[in-house]
Amino acid sequence: MRVSEPSDVVIRSDDTCHIHLTWSGSERRSAAKQHARKVAMKLGVSSGLIYLVGQPTVNWGDSDQPQPFRQRRYFYYLSGIDEPDCYLTYDIQADLLTLYVPDFDLRRAVWMGPTLTIEEAHKQSDVDRVNFFAALQHDLEWWTTKNKGTRPIYVLHDSQQPLIPSKRLWLDNERLLPAMNAARVIKDEYELRMIRQANYISGLAHRKILEDIHRMSTEAEIESSFLATCVSHGAKNQSYAIIAGSGENAAVLHYVKNNEPLDGRQLVCLDAGAEWRCYASDVTRTIPLWTDWPSERARNIYRVVEEMQEECIRRIRKGVRFRDLQLLAHDIAIKGLQKLDILTNDCTSAIYESGASAVFFPHGLGHHVGLEVHDVSKRPITALDGNQANWGNHNFVPLLTDSSWSVPLLDEGMVVTIEPGIYFNRLALLNAQNQPLAKYINFDEAEKYIPIGGVRIEDDILVTAKGYENLTTAPKGEEMLEIIRRGIDNS
């Protein structure tokens, strides 16, 4: 269905579906002012000036062609403006949020169309004032002179500080970034509407591929279909590069070449999510390239990953340690692989501590989602260094801290992914044979699964006051198989 207005599609933990096809004009405006106040609260100050620089127009090296524009996400959080060459200030004491847009340029307007006007900016954002860039320098000097260096100007980085000819300038480049990270990790209603819409469009694109997969012959066709559906529904940008890995490519976590044929392969791992007004979705589905599971091995691995995801999602609620869900996912993976004779029947904790399960499940269970697909937070969600396995350690043992106090808890308003996976990567298995953990792996049996590649299932989950809400609408499991069958029957 082609929609002319954004839609809210919500799949809640009780499996009910709610669809709203219209928004009021006020709902289209960003929540920039609310975000600015939230950041000031996280800073813990009552005065000072926040100064942010938007993404400038930049050409490719040795070229007159501009690089694709992508707004700086911290700037968007406080402005709601997705246009280049803008600036922003927030006077904390005066509670005054001011946006500066590019000056009118007739030549540019003739060639490229006019830049953002003051009136248009007010329609898009709830900032207090909008001025042209020409006023920025004067306003900054006026504020600095007025405060005589007694109040700081907060900037994200040294490279983004204002050029003010003053010897009494007080710049703080340390406190703003962590304050904004702490603010961004909890999403408000405006942000949730954006993330729901991104998921809704992603769901349409995933569904379209399921309907047509029997006609497709290459990974590139899958990618192009996903892009076409997203763009036709107003989502021109993707949250990240599309991953459409078939066969052994499904075992490469960030495979983005998407240039090989599907013929003779069992599964395709499709990791693709649309972006809506700078907010991300992150969705993965593993699709059989047959009317049903192409092999018992493929079905069995899918079922293990399905259980990993369902059990972890079921336990999401405020106050839960995400680290514990990561451990639960590994426990389910180990027991599932033991039943398939891929791992030995030793103690699950010994297998986990050896790193043997990480040969098959080498990444974190999930991450925050928001303005970035791997969104910011005050601390890593699993207390992992970088929220990943230690890739410098060839044993692939995840660095999970044992210090309970340092592990962050899930909180209401967080949006996190639950994305377990099991992979049979030829290089990872070859490397594991030379490690102490090899005693826990039946390599002869594991190698039989290499043609499957890997299985990953990923949804975006909102932590609510009473539990969770699944924001992802893309079909999976039996619903996915039924859509594939109907597509063949209707062709």
Swiss-Prot record:
Binding residues for Mn(2+) 1: 282, 419, 458
Swiss-Prot/TrEMBL GO biological process terms: proteolysis
Enzyme class: hydrolase
Chain segments annotated as transmembrane: none
EC code(s) of this entry: 3.4.11.9
Keyword Lipoprotein: no
Catalysed transformations (reactions): Release of any N-terminal amino acid, including proline, that is linked to proline, even from a dipeptide or tripeptide
Family of the protein in this entry: Belongs to the peptidase M24B family.
Listed name of the protein: Probable Xaa-Pro aminopeptidase AFLA_084750
